[in-house]
């Protein structure tokens, strides 16, 4: 059963189409299924990371905000965060302090936004500007690639984070 939950996003399109063919099912149940499947439409950007071979993939439902990126934030559960914590005790201590693996989006609005600067810089795909990469507790590891582009002018969580930690 765990595989079903892990792979649901791989089959989102087929599952959503299938809900339309469920004859005799209450509309309320079909709507609940559509919401649970939770397909997001957007765009993926690749940010080169200084001194790393692999780029950082960022999925966003707001590609129109790409030019306003102030920081990138990654979940403590990403592969990149794992690599960084093996080399840096301060990052390791921070990641062990926060565990957002079971966090839901509804919980994010209530909790304090905390993070730690990894010291890494990503290269903006259009402007070439260097952008700091943070490990943050408000990034969902199960959404997209577990990384986000911080655009404080267009997102309240990004704004709160940048105001308290980056001092914009």
Locations of the language-model features?
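A generic structural signal for well-ordered coil/turn residues at beta-strand boundaries
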Residues: 2, 39-41, 67-68, 116-118, ...
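Catalytic-site beta-strand/loop segments enriched in glycine and acidic/polar residues
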Residues: 120-159
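Short glycine- and Lys/Arg-enriched binding-loop motifs that mark or flank ligand-binding interfaces
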Residues: 58, 64, 111, 115, ...
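Conserved small/polar residues in nucleotide/adenosyl-binding loops
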Residues: 166-168
């Amino acid at each position: 059963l765990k595989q079903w939950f892990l792979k649901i996003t791989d089959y989102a399109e087929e599952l959503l189409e299938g809900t339309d063919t469920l004859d005799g099912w209450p509309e309320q149940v079909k709507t609940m299924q559509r919401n649970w499947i939770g397909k997001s439409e957007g765009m993926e950007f690749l940010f080169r990371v200084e001194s790393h071979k692999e780029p950082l993939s960022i999925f966003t439902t707001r590609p129109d905000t790409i030019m306003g990126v102030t920081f990138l934030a990654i979940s403590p559960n990403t592969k990149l965060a794992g690599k960084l914590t093996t080399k840096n005790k301060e990052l390791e201590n921070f990641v062990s302090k926060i565990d957002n693996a079971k966090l839901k989006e509804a919980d994010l609005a209530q909790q304090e936004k905390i993070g730690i600067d990894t010291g890494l810089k990503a290269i903006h795909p259009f402007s070439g500007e260097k952008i700091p990469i943070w490990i943050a507790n408000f990034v969902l590891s199960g959404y997209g690639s577990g990384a986000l582009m911080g655009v404080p002018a267009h997102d309240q969580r990004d704004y709160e984070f940048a105001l308290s930690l980056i001092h914009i």
